[in-house]
């Protein structure tokens, strides 16, 4: 570990006066109380309890949000790691950075659908994709769980449910509940804004099986479920059975440096007192993506921070002019909030939520939950960690070129295109040149502005009420 970065992370995660992570206290029902719990008491001073039908006595404790943070370098070395908020009081306490899995939300989009879409040559920087649901209500693919509950239809099979047109809904929705405006958007814009309607179309092109195989086997996200997580909802929207750990997610984002993946490790070797090797690190390194795809993805994820439309717009670290990339993520019902960010030196994953998953908007306002707490904590850490480091750039790939594209067609700009912007493309997979007869100019947002094999069958979880994540 790097003592400077570890110290900075520990100080940040003390979270003095809830500086980064609001508490969001709420009552939690448990079957036993420990000395460390903040027990809920009645007005008369007696413990608040409830007795179940089977005689079980339930107690209540006040719990607050927790957080975890882990930083790696691009050789897989664990630079710093903190597994919880506040002062550490136990040597073997729960470490949420490597010992607890969480649903990824949208942080899985770039490492799966988008990366493979670029790698396979299915999409590029400016591929136009429709901002609308993949499945419409009339397709009768996705159940409307709320409607089914209200009308006593939960026990019906899909075949039986076909008799109830209102028992279905369009899918996916974007974060906030909208279904998109039906316009065509360039891929970079959909990724920067974390639009589910755009990501799901890329995922449908790549295929859920291909995405799962890549993130499970190549990126070693081994806590994903090989049976229940092979579907677009899980592989694009991040609604997995168990999810992944912050350390595993940080390791997966290593690939946006130069395409290489290295298993994370805490040591290189351990020697005994005589200098003999007692333990040797068995980390493995290999090329997960081509360097060309990695650099295109790096530029795409830069937009999350540097574009005026990015979900973390303007929240990049001020570190001697060094660039950064990142991805926000929110799991179902605001139960898990994420940010994974990279600089030329480090890649970091930050998680914020409750130990027992709970809708954070029930204890915090939606604005509080969406103030990008995780990205601001990452920004503060990187500004400290990189304060004295010399300038370093991400490695550009010789197989990637900058080209102007037509903002109306997404093709390379032709002589008659009235509105153009700059994109990054693999030199061996350039779009055609636009020859369309254009109407009125429509300028896309400037990305530089500061501030599956054949598509596989979608596997839909039994409960589809929480499939729309950020």
PLM regions: where:
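Conserved catalytic neighborhood of penicillin-recognizing serine enzymes
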Residues: 122-211, 232, 273-303
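Non-catalytic, structured segments within soluble enzyme domains
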Residues: 1, 7, 221-222, 234-238
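Extended, hydrophobic alpha-helical segments in both membrane/secreted and soluble proteins
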Residues: 78, 104-118, 125, 198-199, ...
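Secondary-structure transition/capping motifs at alpha-helix termini
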Residues: 73, 88, 118-127, 222-226, ...
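Short, charged, amphipathic alpha-helices and their helix-cap/turn boundaries
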Residues: 206-224
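Surface-exposed aromatic
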Residues: 92-97, 230-236
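Long, low-complexity, intrinsically disordered segments
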Residues: 454-470
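A penicillin-recognizing enzyme superfamily signal
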Residues: 2-61, 65-71, 78-83, 87-100, ...
């Amino acid at each position: 570990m790097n003592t400077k970065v570890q110290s900075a992370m520990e100080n940040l995660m003390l979270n003095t006066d809830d500086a980064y992570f609001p508490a969001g206290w709420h009552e939690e029902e448990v079957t036993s109380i420990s000395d460390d719990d903040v027990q809920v008491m009645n007005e008369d001073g007696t413990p608040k309890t409830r007795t179940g039908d089977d005689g079980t006595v339930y107690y209540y404790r006040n719990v607050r949000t927790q957080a975890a943070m882990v930083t790696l370098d691009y050789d897989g070395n664990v630079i710093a790691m903190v597994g919880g908020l506040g002062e550490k009081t136990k040597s073997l306490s729960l470490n949420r950075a490597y010992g607890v899995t969480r649903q990824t939300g949208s942080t899985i989009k770039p490492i799966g659908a988008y990366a493979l879409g670029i790698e396979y040559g299915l999409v590029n920087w400016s591929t136009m994709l429709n901002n609308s649901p993949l499945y419409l209500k009339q397709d009768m693919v996705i159940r409307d769980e709320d409607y089914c509950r209200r009308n006593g239809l939960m026990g019906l099979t899909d075949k039986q449910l076909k008799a109830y047109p209102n028992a279905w809904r369009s899918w996916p929705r974007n974060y906030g509940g909208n279904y998109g405006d039906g316009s065509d958007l360039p891929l970079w814009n959909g990724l920067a804004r974390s639009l589910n309607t755009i990501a799901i179309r890329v995922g449908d092109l790549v295929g859920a099986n291909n995405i799962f195989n890549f993130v499970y086997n190549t990126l070693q996200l081994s806590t994903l479920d090989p049976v229940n997580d092979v579907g677009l909802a899980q592989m694009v929207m991040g609604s997995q059975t168990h999810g992944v750990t912050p350390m595993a997610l940080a390791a997966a984002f290593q690939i946006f440096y130069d395409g290489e993946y290295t298993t994370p490790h805490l040591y290189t070797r351990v020697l005994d007192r005589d200098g003999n090797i007692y333990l040797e690190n068995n980390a493995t390194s290999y090329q997960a993506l081509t360097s060309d795809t990695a650099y295109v993805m790096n530029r795409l994820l830069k937009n999350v921070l540097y574009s005026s439309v990015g979900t973390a717009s303007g929240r990049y670290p001020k570190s001697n002019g060094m660039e950064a990339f990142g991805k926000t993520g929110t799991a179902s019902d605001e139960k898990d909030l994420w940010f994974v960010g990279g600089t030329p030196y480090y890649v970091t994953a930050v998680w914020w939520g409750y130990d027992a998953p709970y809708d954070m908007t029930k204890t915090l306002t939606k604005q509080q939950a969406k103030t990008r707490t995780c990205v601001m904590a990452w920004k503060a850490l990187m500004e400290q960690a990189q304060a004295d480091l010399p300038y370093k750039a991400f490695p550009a790939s010789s197989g990637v070129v900058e080209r102007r594209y037509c903002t109306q067609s997404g093709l390379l700009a032709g002589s008659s295109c009235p509105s153009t912007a700059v994109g990054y493309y693999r030199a061996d997979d350039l779009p055609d040149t636009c020859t369309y007869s254009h109407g009125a100019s429509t300028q896309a947002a400037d990305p530089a502005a500061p501030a599956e094999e054949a598509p596989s069958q979608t596997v839909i979880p039994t409960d589809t009420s929480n499939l729309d994540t950020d």
